[in-house]
Structure formats: C-alpha cells, structure tokens
A protein has these predicted regions:
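Long, charge-dense low-complexity segments
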Residues: 1-174
Length: 174
C-alpha cells in the first residue's frame, strides 16, 4: 500500500538529524547485541539474547515521512522539541508546545498470523494482538480548538499528499 521509493519524501541517506539519530541508535544496539551474543557463546551457561532485526520497509517509510515532516515544520519557522523513536513528537510553534504521534495505524488481529510482528524491527513498541494496517497515522495529542486532529493514510491518499495539510495545521495551532 505504500511506495518505498516515493521521491517526495526524504531519502534514508539524508534524514533529519533527530531521525538519523534513531537509525544510528538502532545500528549501535544491533552491534552491541551481536557482541554480547558472541561473548555469551563462549560461556558455559551462555544462551543468546534475542536478535535485533534490521529496519523493515515500514520502519524506513515511517522514518522518511517523519523526517520530511520535521524539515517542513522547520522551514515554516517551527521547531522540533522532543522526538522519540516510538513516534511521539513535540513541536514548538510560537512558544506553544504541540504533542503529536506519528505511528503505524494498527488494527486488531482477527486470527493469529504467522510472522505478524515481522513488519517492524520494534515489535515491543506496539500492543500484542494488533497488527499493522499498512498505513501511517498522524494524531495531535494536544487539543487544538477543543478537539484532537487525526490524519490517516489510505490507499488513495498517501502520506506525501497529506503532509502539507498536517504542516499547515501544526503551524496554525502555534
């Protein structure tokens, strides 16, 4: 449902510094886990710890969308406050904080699907029993004008098309 090669989004080699830090942290965690497992394999009682997966296409897509959104907000005069790997972000616009979540749209699994958690390298960031819908969702956690805003990607409306509306709403909320 998504185009991993969408040219309107930031490339993985040119991500926003906050998003680039997430990728670097993930790689560093993978390397330290490999080193720890090598060390444990030499121990008599040593069992290995769970392997940390590579970033999936869905992870890379979410990172590219997030990076593009960050750059657009900064271009409009906003700032990026706190930005967590889970997708929780704080934007600072005109000295006003706006909390937002950029995450995978999840749906309840009606039956157990083999390999259902393989869509992300971060399965511990999501509730069990939920699976990816294949679309991203951007939600304001801060109420603006008495309501919360929500944008959900669909097969007809890709996130690259929705991003200008999101940027406008964030800047207008400040």
């Amino acid at each position: 449902p998504f185009d991993e090669n969408d040219e309107s989004l930031d490339h993985m080699r040119a991500l926003h510094p906050k998003v680039k830090a997430w990728v670097a942290e993930h790689r560093q965690l993978q390397e330290s886990r490999r080193a720890e497992n090598r060390q444990r394999s030499r121990d008599f009682w040593g069992g290995s710890l769970r392997h940390i997966s590579d970033l999936t296409a869905r992870d890379r897509y979410r990172f590219r969308v997030t990076s593009t959104l960050f750059r657009a907000i900064e271009k409009q005069g906003g700032q990026i406050g706190e930005a967590k790997l889970t997708g929780k972000v704080t934007f600072l616009v005109s000295d006003q904080e706006l909390k937002c979540v950029i995450a995978e749209k999840m749906s309840r699994a009606t039956k157990i699907i083999e390999g259902a958690g393989k869509w992300t390298a971060f399965p511990h960031h999501h509730q069990t029993g939920l699976v990816s819908s294949g679309f991203l969702r951007v939600r304001f956690d801060t109420y603006v004008n008495g309501r919360s805003r929500d944008w959900i990607e669909t097969s007809k409306k890709k996130m690259a098309i929705i991003l200008p509306d999101i940027v406008s709403a964030i800047i207008a909320a400040g």
